[in-house]
Amino acid sequence: MGSDWDEIKRLAADFQKAQLTSTLQKLSERNCVEIVTLLLEKQLLEVVFTNNGKEYITPDHLEREIQDELYANGGRANLVEVSRTLNVDLSRIVALAERIAAENPLVHLVLGQLIDEDYISHIAQEINEKLALRGEISISDLASQFDLPSEFLQQDVVEKHLGKIIKGRQDATNPRVFFTQAYIQRCKAKIRGALAAITRPTNVAVILQQINVQEKIFHSLLDEISPAGQVTSKLANAQYVPHIYAKTQADWVNSFYKQNSFLEYDAINKLGISDAKSYIRKQFPNEEFLFLKRVALGARLVELTVVTALNECSATKQYLDLTTILPSNLSEEDIEEVFSAIMAQKHSNPSNFVYLDSIVFSQPYLTELVQPCHALAEAQAKAAIDSGVYQQFVVEKTLAQKGNASFQDQDDDGKLDKRDERRKKASSGKAGGGAQGRETKTKSTKKHQRRSAAAQNDSDDEDDVQHQGSRGAGGGGGNKKTVKPLDLVKTADIEKLINASLQEEGLEHLAPSIAALYLNQLNQAALAKAQELYEATPQTNRRQTHAAIQDRINTLLIDIRLYEKGLKLFSHDTQTQLVKYLLKSLGNDICNELSLYVASECNLTVKNTSLNVDQRIKLAQECDAEYRSALLEQNKALNKSIDDFELATESVLKACSMIIKKVDKKKDRLLIADHKNKLQQQLLDCQEPALLLHLAALILFTTISGCILHASGKFVSAILQHIRGSLSDQQNDMLLRYHDLVLQVLQTAPESDDSKIAHEQLQIMQSKVVELAQNYTRASVSKAD
């Protein structure tokens, strides 16, 4: 202690000496400014100027003054206020405040404010007092009160001092809420008392309103309380159901189900249970139910009663009234739903039963019941034939089908004309054409089937590869003609026959339903019988034969006309040979068809249907005079021109009372396209080189000329020569090479080396020839008029 006092005396003496000593040299204010400026320029000194520039201060001293301001303001200082108090730029204050907060862990920079631990401890004490007063507090309330960020309050204030300064606990479901244990105990007491007083289902919202407890606290404390009841859910419309009430519900449901083996949803809903199906599943976990729209049937009622009764009904071939075995309070809709559900679960075969107004009939029972109606159907069919009603129906139906076919043809032709017009507009004005100007393949909604026609061999005895067929009209157009269905059996007739049997069982009220059920079936049986009787009449057979031959002849004449256009593109000599071949093949078919028809009309016996010229002449001389001259003239016309043959054929058709169809040139393109498609299909299936070349030549001719051609294999060279100008040199060389190899194979021995080499080369070139024929197109296609 004495040494300290001596030290104080020595310092006082030094201080007195300094005061008494006079300054050797005083500096003026200007000199001081210059010295400071020089130090600043040489960066030997760092100062901070005030806002007015009249004063300056070192950063370290400014930092001390900021800390003094923090202390003077109780541990929380707003940097804007500090800047105004110290008369220093705010940016300087902020920079130093950040340095202070970074260097001192006890100081925090929050939203432009410096806050130290003393202030944090102070507000923690305030929070603790408020929590003790209210019992619960949230971070959002504290943020509003202290004007501080909620994250800062939660992490650096509340959670940091929780259990120390702040006496409370954090809500597990909501970390931003804190409460005291005493508050929790008060809430538990309120909840326990309220739930103990409830004897019927009560809305949770009503309970919370009465006891003034928050919903989240109610649900979090409910499990800890273990009340004598349960809450239906945690949603807004949740209810609290006391166990005593739930037990009463369960006892009633169990008792009702035990007595009746079914449960009504409405009855369960009246007990205060909203989801009846879920409640039933929960109440009877080991029971199987058939859940319907209004009721739930137990498995015992379904299996032991209904299914057993249905099986017995099927075995005895009788009927079953379901109202006698099902509960009386089930409506007809419920009973029908029960039956449908049982059939859907395949407890029994659905095809064995018919359900009508709560009555289930076995199929054999109904079959036996309507058995007399089949005799009625046959009688009605015979009466319709005898009276001509069915014949009139057939005629009207045929006319309607022809009318629909004509509408479809007009529609298809109109579409085809529009497509042609669009193609012409698109191609007009274009020079050349190239790949962009090629002909577009037109699809038709009508299908033409061209029958195979066996062509006779010409002088070179070569096989023909052309196959023509009869064409059938496709579906109808928009204005279809309909024929009223012919009902040979009436509902009243069926009711009259089955009513007597139903009256014995007291089921006469079901007669109209059963009659309607079998009306269509009996009508179809009657129509089938009428058709059978109709086809059995000789007159009908003759009329059908007449119509079929007329259609075939017209088809062949159209084919000849189309082939004639194609052969006219060749030279005169080749054209003459093609005409001769055409008449020997298709013309011969026409003569045979008509000769056989006339022989049938004249009751002449013909052993062989493939007739030659001499046989046809002999047959014509034996037939009636009205046919004789026309048939003889037609046979002679086979060696003349196509026009002569067509005129002779028209005479024969006139004698046979057959009609020649009017030429419809609009259909030509469709027929040509169909013919080409058939040739292409044959080409894809063909493996024989000679036939393949023949088909390829015909397809290329059709593509290039737009016409079809009926030619045998000997005309392949002429066809290739004709289309030569439309193909490239490479394509021509390939076809000629393939043609030469085919001739080599035909002219050499099959087992020779030359033949084998030629076969190998043909196999290599085959795909190229097929590809050329299938994919070749031209910008413009020349067509015969």
Curated annotation (Swiss-Prot):
One of its GO terms (biological process) is regulation of proteasomal ubiquitin-dependent protein catabolic process. The keyword Transmembrane helix does not apply. It comes from the Eukaryota. It holds the Pfam family UFL1_C. Its EC number is 2.3.2.-. InterPro entries: Ufl1 (IPR018611), Ufl1-like_C (IPR056761), Ufl1_dom (IPR056580), Ufl1_N (IPR056579). Keywords: Transferase, Ubl conjugation pathway. GO terms for molecular function: UFM1 ligase activity. Residues 405-483 are annotated as: Disordered. GO terms for cellular component: endoplasmic reticulum membrane. E3 UFM1-protein ligase that mediates ufmylation of target proteins. Belongs to the UFL1 family. PANTHER family: E3 UFM1-PROTEIN LIGASE 1. This is E3 UFM1-protein ligase 1 homolog. It comes from Drosophila pseudoobscura pseudoobscura.
